[in-house]
Amino acid sequence: MKYLSVLALLLFTGQAIAADGPLVEKVRKANDRFKDVKVAIAEGYAPIPCASGLTGGAMGIHYVNGDLLKSGKVDVEHPQAIMYEPQAGGKLDLIAVEYIAFKGPASLEGHLFNFVSEPNRYGLDKFYEMHVWAWRENPTGAFADMNPKVSCDAALSP
């Protein structure tokens, strides 16, 4: 009973987030270079429009590397997509990365990817993906697709 009380306290206070902490921290350290979007562009990433959630929140602007997408490799240091939230004045804030594989089930460091069937909003064949919100806290989880704390509003502004 004592352990259940401690677990309940940890869950209630939000301190139990550490369960996904090691991978999030590893991803952050391996990809911090992408805070400067020029680095992403130099490494072959190109932008696709900001992706908003159907029921709120967003994923942000994805910078996708076609060569990494085709490679089929899952490597913590080379995500297939890098995600930025647009800010006023055109600034982009690094918020997350996305790992994508067309064969699966796919995983990274023991974390299984989500399966995306076809047809899908991206017009792609079925695939597996995992977002890692390493630079922006996500109340729905560090590996959730959408983040209610992210917006595409600045991308839509003139």
Where are these regions (language model features)?
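N-terminal signal peptide c-region/cleavage motif recognized by signal peptidases
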Residues: 13-14
